[in-house]
């Protein structure tokens, strides 16, 4: 048995969605908390702890691959109910951005090895069976749609360079597939295909350089394409030595338990598909978890107001509760099967993980505000005129003299006036009246009474 300590007994982690304790974030750029490994319960927690124990691979890489692998195993087994009674698919998608040598392939092999081994066993017994389409490698829309028509539960797991950019042109279709929304008519080479009750998840592993080229196209800030809002994103820059990678492994007990869980999940999925992919069991939240979920959604939406500094990421944050709910469904099914209700503890664990990914998303797509022309001109005056004057022992001058000097910097009278207002507003200079004319003090501690 694999046990997990309740969330209430663990140290709280800070979130921009539901801040706890006295944690503070930078007013300049979003910060990112340590990855909440404790958010994984039971067997999933043992898997993540084993693979991060050596410290060779970043915890966020291990956790993201774990979430994607568990989603592949569980998404076809159950749905989850929203508070209003509507059913939704479970599952999560991840984009892992890290350089070669970061260890993501080693982690991927540990999680996907038992799955691929089982699929090879099924393929040997039945070469034309549904299992041939469970793992997709072709990122083109026709191939994905055709595969889901053959096998309505699938995952696109790939480390092909630039694959994220290739998928963007088909984002409208992919969003429906990721959400589990019916696709009434999709054109493929053999005609048109209608999909219903399909379940699809993605794990995309990218190199930093290729991802940086794609990032502006993803629309992570307000007004984006929408597909990226369905993903957990992680950008890790660390590399580990080749010798350290040899220490990334599962203990014999955990590896055996994981293999058994893979066989169990895929066995149930096989039975479900052989019965014609009928409606899945629908999970619901306990009364306590229900109230917590309402609060999560309410507080996330409060972060999306125009006055909030998180407003640029509001399209991602507004889907925070949805990602929490779908991830909670994954954790519950992976740990407990399709029976019972999702507990408050499971929901809080899913929230702690999803909170971290909100911070990660904001950090990845953060853009410092661009200075206005007046602010740029103010900096030019400070560097080109005020600085040299102070170094030369000049602590002030008339407005007319400063305006004349500003012409040498290419500033017109109008631009100078606006820049001067910025300098005064920033407290870098002070305007006074001296000898019946406007005077500018460069050194605010210097008094004209001493002149």
Regions found by a protein language model. Give the residues of each.
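Phosphate-handling catalytic cores of nucleic-acid transaction enzymes
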Residues: 2-451
